[in-house]
Amino acid sequence: MAAKIFCLIMLLGLSASAATASIFPQCSQAPIASLLPPYLSPAMSSVCENPILLPYRIQQAIAAGILPLSPLFLQQSSALLQQLPLVHLLAQNIRAQQLQQLVLANLAAYSQQQQLPLVHLLAQNIRAQQLQQLVLANLAAYSQQQQFLPFNQLAALNSAAYLQQQQLLPFSQLAAAYPRQFLPFNQLAALNSHAYVQQQQLLPFSQLAAVSPAAFLTQQHLLPFYLHTAPNVGTLLQLQQLLPFDQLALTNPAVFYQQPIIGGALF
């Protein structure tokens, strides 16, 4: 009896599962239709009968809707690719126009920059012309400066000799003006340079040379006699200082030389 009851329960369960399996596909038609995109065709939406096939059916419907649009997309892409060189050319033209406007705006500065070497060359030529004009205007001073160039070199090498030579310059000019009168002293310089230098060192103390060259030459003629009578340089210097006050030495040097008593009384 119990076995019969158990078999009856099993049959009721199987019938209930079969009824449920036949109902679910019929109830799932409305949700599936609501999930499909609106741009799909009715034929595509009607084929969706099983929920398991829903993703695959949706993918096929999307592909079927996109494929008719693909030729237009390819045509637009090819047109864009063909227009790329024109875009590059247009960009280059814009850059060239901007550069041209910049050059036109700074044309003055650009021209000045290009003319800088010419300006420097012109300035150098002007300086050279000014120097040449200065040399031509002061040709005498320039030649005199060139003549003194050896003395300047001597001053750089030996300052003492340069100072001694500078002290002798006035008398050298006087000797050039009166070469015959200075001939004995030139011979003395050739024979005894030390005595000549001592004699020339005493000459600046005589103011008579600047006042009267003739009297100075007479005084120079008397120097050899003083070199014999006054071997001391200090004594000779004192005699040189007394010469302007002795009028006899200027008028008659021979008579003045015959008066050694004056020298003995003074020194």
Curated annotation (Swiss-Prot):
Pfam families: Zein (PF01559). The keyword Repeat applies. This is Zein-alpha Z4. Zeins are major seed storage proteins. GO terms for molecular function: nutrient reservoir activity. Residues 1-21 form the signal peptide. The alpha zeins of 19 kDa and 22 kDa account for 70% of the total zein fraction. They are encoded by a large multigene family. Structurally, 22K and 19K zeins are composed of nine adjacent, topologically antiparallel helices clustered within a distorted cylinder. InterPro entries: Zein (IPR002530), Zein-alpha (IPR051903). Keywords: Repeat, Seed storage protein, Signal, Storage protein. Belongs to the zein family. It comes from Zea mays. The keyword Transmembrane helix does not apply.
